[in-house]
Amino acid sequence: MRRSPSALYFILLFTLYAPFVPAQSPMQLSGRVTDPNNASVSGAVLTLIARDNRLRTTVMTASDGSYRFEHVAAGDYLLEARAAGFAKTVRAVSIKPNGERLDIALDVAAINDNVIVTAAGTAQSVDELSKAVTVIDAQQMEMRGEYSILETLRTAPGLRVTQLGGPGAFGRIQVRGLRSFDTAILVDGLRFRDAADVQGSANGYISELNVVSCERVEVLRGSGSSLYGSHAIGGVVNLVTDQGGGRLRGQAQFEGGSLGLFRERVNVAGGALKDRLFYSAGLSQLNVTDGVDGDDRTRQTSLQGLLGVHFTPNVTLSGRVYANDAFLALNESPANAPGFVAPPPGTLVRAIALDRGEQRRIETRGVPLTPTNYNRGNANFIPDLNDPDNRRNSGFFSGALSFMQRLNNTADYRLSYHRAEADRSFLDGPLGIGSFGEPAFTSIGDFASDIDTFTARVDLRMGGANLLTAGYEFERERYGDFSSDESPNPPSASLGITERSHAFFAQNQTKLFDDRFQLSLAFRLQNFELSSPRFSGGAPRYVGVTFNSPPRAYTGDGSVSYFFKSTNTKLRAHVGNGYRSPSLFERFGASFFFGDFTAFGDPRLKPERSIAVDGGIDQTLLRGRVRLSATYFYTRLQNIIDFGSPPPDDPSNRIFGGFLNFAGGLSRGVELSAQISPGRSTELFASYTYANADQRAPDAAGNLTTPGASAHIFTLVATQRIARRFDITFDLSAVSDYSPSFPSPSFDTRYVFDGYVKADINAGYTLPINDRHSLRFYGKVENALDRTYFESGFRAPGATFTGGMSYRF
């Protein structure tokens, strides 16, 4: 696909100009970090974050506990301090023209504090939040032994995480009982999605987002469309990478275990020239040679990098990349068992899987199933059968350049360019015993997309109470697919289409009463321009159909909170409407069969719209050792897009079905969570979510429940440190019964799958070499209870073991 360098040229112009911007005299922030007994804490990591999120830099304390940030501009910041064996602490600080000093005393027994940037697009402490946000940091990921962002999110409140098989298999995230594509995925605050995905989401790459150089993951539950645009109807997941700065640090890690799993990871970060230059980089390799059925091979190579320069304390240029290359062996989709007689219409069928031994015999024999040529027993569905020559090759690239300048103490601006590319190829040969048969020759389907985004943003501080953010965003997305096979006279077909959009956004954040009162109001207007599709090979579809651009999107968002300092109680409320433009595939998607296109899309589709409300209370007790949270949520999907049967007068003659507009459903429920730190060596976290998620109208089986949603979700994470060097973490997730979208003998039947409990145990031992170097040895048992369960008919791994070591400096 062609690349448009215009935005790059624009930012490079500022790069040439930046060194000549008049520099203010450099400021500094210094101080000392101590423990509760006023003893110095050496090796503590301190991160300074600008309130407008334009700067994030890190230093470490010296042997006497002292620290110093140099070459920083005057202004408002949050300072985050963390050290092994202590609770993470966040302090607000205003750096004045003559510098500032801030001493920090760390607590050994308290709930970790965090700096959050996803809720408002600016840096906030936990006490300042007016929305429901969960943070999982790098230390928690290490204690749990997680290498996948998908598994990291499994214990977050309100989230239902599914993976269709073993490591590297397709995954999904559902927030508060909504659909998986209702969650926006960000990398360092930049939207990450695939324009060639059916819904234009990041679903196809969720399982390829691995822990490479990750600092933390932030999860916003509730509408975020006014800040982050399309696909943020239900929530936002923001993967924040290491921002570099400070002394050189890094890690080298190797692990291996069950399922033929091997993983290697290296990362480094630091700064130079007194932190005028800051950088981070990471490389990860995941290989799975066996998988669940012995032939589920997976390979993933991931790269992350950041390089930036502070020309002056007020002028910064940075660039970042995140890329992945992957291979995944695919199985057949689960299907109903031949010979199973469907019950009367409207009946929910309890899913019963075919015996695993019989499934292996069927796969070895390689003969298509009939009602009489296998031993069905009492099974009514067949889990994913092995398909020896079905595979997917994929890759993505996300790269960004950002230029930021602070004009004075009240105004700054930033310009950024972001490019996201994605390419997926599916190849399926004649082997296997699929329910719909196998191709005579290897079929090839390639789906590629690229998205270019240019953003200009201004932040204005109006007095000490208001921060106004306003900006413009231009986005161009292109989607193309290609279909062929390896026959002697291969057919070929392709489709290409482009869409552009212009968005204007604004947000005002108000803080009053010594920052105890927080009010945020946001608005976004987005306009779309659609080109005509380009078909080649086979007769084109959508002839005579008017190609109208989607209507303008107007979204608003408001949140408010008040913190009662005397009782450490916070009340909060959040309301927002969401919007999702029809994807390019939903409007023009087609499949190529027998030398012709079969249309699935509808160029006339209306966008999806929603309204969401939530409110809650956060209570801190026992001098910060206990934090309780309760949230009620309500989301109504006013208009949705789904697959169905078009009317007889459908202009595109979609005889096999297609995408249509429907009235949406709703989800309402509660989220409860508790964090407890009874002592410096023990941490507990538990959450319970009840989500009553219904469609507007029952399906053919008479079921109202949203496909894939579990009404009850419980999570638990318990960490115990022993003698400072040994730690053990137990994490558990339990979900109730659910009914996914799943093939059935007739459209009048709906399968119900049993809920499950997944428990993991990770233990580690850290061996210090000196003050800055250490070795860590660890082992993890996943699904430690060895439960047999299925995700939408795909068999999950039983009990597995992984062990490894890491060297940290």
Give short role names for the model-derived ranges:
Residues T34-A39, V45-R51, R82-F86, K96-E142, ...:
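Short, acidic, small-residue-rich periplasmic hinge/interaction motif at the N-terminus
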Residues V133, L150-D194, I206:
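Extracytoplasmic beta-strand/coil segments of soluble accessory domains associated
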Residues R172, R191-R221, L239-V240, P334, ...:
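Short acidic/polar hinge/loop motifs at secondary-structure boundaries
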Residues S258-N287, V292-V367, D389-L415, M462, ...:
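Transmembrane beta-barrel wall of Gram-negative outer-membrane proteins
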Residues A269, D275, T410-D428, S561-F563, ...:
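Membrane-embedded beta-barrel scaffold of Gram-negative outer-membrane proteins
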Residues A269, G308-T312, N508, S561-F564, ...:
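Conserved C-terminal beta-signal and adjacent last beta-strands/turns
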Residues F441-F447, I451-R457, I497-F505, F600-K606, ...:
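Outer membrane beta-barrel strand-and-loop segments of large Gram-negative receptors
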Residues G464, L468, E475, K511-A522, ...:
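Gram-negative outer-membrane beta-barrel transporters
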